[in-house]
């Protein structure tokens, strides 16, 4: 299939469509920035339409891990410098982090409740090719693995990541920069 990047605001969701949401989308919907970011409504509306049309949303451990780690780091970076530990790991091991970890877990559970789990394709991915593309220095390793998952399971990727390279997958986004990609 030739890659197609489509505007999520204009996409007509159909029964049988299957999606993989990138971690940045989960951050916009269930992350700490959800109420502060105008993009939240666009992707939340798409999520409602996906669910209304009985489409499937898949998630793998890479994306869930990215969501959890990004949420944690966001909270760490928001701390007042006076009380902020120097190292993230010190913060993560502090009593202060416990309530944040609980909030992250609550939101991660919301995600997994509405998703089908899939494996990360580590065993079957063409890792030498993925590493060859990675060593060229212009692509993220996890993003490449996400592409492998989408290709193997015929999933459409929902992302706001402008750095995503058009590959042999379909992408839904509200990101104007990504929509301009040929």
Predicted segments with their positions:
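Acidic active-site catalytic centers that drive phospho-/nucleotidyl reactions
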Residues: 22-24, 143, 161
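Active-site neighborhoods of divalent-metal-dependent phosphate/nucleic-acid chemistry enzymes
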Residues: 2-3, 101-156
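Acidic, PIN/NYN-like endoribonuclease modules and their adjacent C-terminal/linker elements
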Residues: 1-14, 133, 147-182
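Short, well-structured N-terminal submotif of metal-dependent ribonuclease cores
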Residues: 1-63, 70-87, 153
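Well-ordered, non-membrane alpha-helical segments in soluble/globular domains
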Residues: 37-46, 98-108
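Helix-adjacent hinge/juxtasegments
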Residues: 77-103
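Short, solvent-exposed loop/turn segments at secondary-structure junctions
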Residues: 26-27, 63-66, 163-165, 178
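A short acidic, often aromatic-flanked loop/helix-cap motif at beta-alpha or helix-coil junctions
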Residues: 65, 122-128, 177-182
